[in-house]
Design a protein with these regions (language model features):
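Membrane-interface anchor segments at the N-terminal boundary of transmembrane helices
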Residues: 97-173
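Hydrophobic alpha-helical membrane-interfacial segments at the cytosolic entry of transmembrane helices
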Residues: 2-17
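Transmembrane helix-loop junctions and nearby membrane-interface residues
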Residues: 15, 156-162, 181-187
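Hydrophobic transmembrane alpha-helices
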Residues: 1-2, 156-157, 199-204
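Hydrophobic/aromatic-rich transmembrane helices and adjacent perimembrane loops
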Residues: 178-179, 186-204
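Membrane-proximal stem/loop segments at transmembrane-domain junctions that anchor or position
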Residues: 15-119
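Central hydrophobic cores of alpha-helical transmembrane segments
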Residues: 2-4, 168-177
Length: 204
């Protein structure tokens, strides 16, 4: 109860301050609605869609963005059909959870300036293990995958633990899986936000 009151009070105060702040002018028409992320969750791999992102930037109002997203959702569901959508969900869940590196180097501009190791000493040693053209990047991927499989096996073999705490963590993971199936996903990096639940379950 204390946690709920504290969280609710904090949210109300922060929300009030944001709505009444004068430092930054906020253009509400540029807000991206939540349904947009459900829409791109239905793209080819269920991940980021440049086409839909561009539409969000070009449409003039929030309602226009919502209408566009609804139309695209209906179009994509109709195109797949029931069996096609079920198959898509299985494939998307595999993409969401299978990669132990959490999609390291698969996307993102932050690494484009450092794909080739150029450092010295310990810095170079790290770069060889994590950069795209590092000599040991394959070793990193292999070890990360082994670690991930072991973590999942520990969780799976711990099914006999039926305490409230364990069940709460399992429900949190199920909720995370469902969230990523409904919204933007398609790669394991989206699973990072749920890592605390995996690690806690694996350690029990």
């Amino acid at each position: 109860m204390i946690t709920l009151i504290t969280a609710g009070g904090t949210y109300a105060v922060c929300n009030h301050q944001l709505e009444n702040q004068q430092y930054i002018a906020i253009d509400e028409s540029r807000a991206i609605p939540m349904i947009h992320f459900m829409n791109i969750g239905l793209t080819n791999d269920g991940g980021y869609s440049p086409e839909d992102a561009q539409a969000m930037a070009e449409l003039p109002t929030k309602q226009a963005k919502i209408d566009y997203s609804k139309e695209k959702i209906q179009e994509r569901l109709k195109e797949r059909g029931v069996l096609g959508y079920i198959s898509f969900l299985f494939q998307k869940h595999r993409n969401n959870t299978a990669d132990g590196t959490f999609a390291w180097l698969k996307e993102g501009s932050f690494i484009q300036e450092g794909e080739t190791p150029k450092g010295k000493g310990f810095t170079r040693w790290l770069q060889e293990g994590y950069y795209l053209y590092g000599n040991r990047i394959a070793d990193f991927r292999f070890m990360a995958q082994i670690w991930w499989v072991i973590c999942l096996l520990i969780i799976a073999f711990g099914w006999k633990r039926q305490g409230k705490y364990e069940q709460m963590l399992r429900l949190s993971l199920i909720g995370g899986f469902l969230f990523l199936l409904l919204f933007e996903g398609g790669r394991s990096r989206y699973l990072i936000q749920f890592l605390p639940f995996f690690l806690l379950l694996a350690s029990l």
